[in-house]
């Protein structure tokens, strides 16, 4: 090859290398943003690690990122040197990194206030991407409710006797209309198992209602399971804590032995797949 040919070859080689360096990271990739309320509990984070692993397996070739909707948890983690982005910050970063198609997946349980705030944020950033979608949370239909209830009842330890009760703790959504989804889930639970019940921390059905039923049935033992994505502070303190106001303590005062099963819903592959099925449906649309 003559000297001119070598120079031309080197020129194009350098130009190609420069293009690769300056190429926006996301130009040839789509991104998935997994959005959750968040947790600061190291043990509870196992649930997020599990759904992250399953998402990467189900959607190879997609960039997987996370956002926490809870400012309180983000600040708490930041004090420990762990930086988590809000949905707004995450979308801005995805834009800066050059991603064109972004699929946000809500990891909330119901389409409550947190979910609708996410929808609002997505609407603001929609103009910044060729495609920006948000997929619904776990319980988005009665089919989702029935499937989730069936799976969670199957997670009760096998040594449970038929006279033992099962009590699920949901978060609840206060006065938000979507709180009725917990009521629907509670009815589905009771239809499936006469000694299984749902109560919420902040909404309906209430713990007092569930306690009254357990006392009426003269239950002596109850398995306690969080109906939440992670087994975080609510599960460890409000459900199974040693404090006087925990469900475990109140049940004990009423002669009911508690068996806590502290595992977040996102730790179960079959539950996690419901979220990912919502995401897959959106991506294929």
Ranges and model annotations:
Residues 19-285:
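Active-site-proximal alpha-helix that buttresses catalytic centers in soluble enzyme cores
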Residues 2-8:
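Sec-dependent signal peptide recognition
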Residues 9-17:
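Hydrophobic h-region of N-terminal signal peptides that target proteins for export
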